[in-house]
């Protein structure tokens, strides 16, 4: 997959879904704040530029949904 290729919405939703699964499996509350923390931790641990982009966009998506689509 080309790194310059546009990130698909499915990739963002998958990243959020994986973060949700992590929170549920470990007994943490499923909140937007916790999701953003998990996505940030995954971003820090990731070494793949494309995955970092997907995770960053997923955090931005959650932030927009929390604060409204301005």
Say what each PLM segment does.
Residues 1-29:
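N-terminal acidic leader/helix
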Residues 1-3, 67-70:
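Short acidic DE-rich linear segments
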Residues 34-67:
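Short, charge-rich amphipathic interface segments used for partner binding and complex assembly
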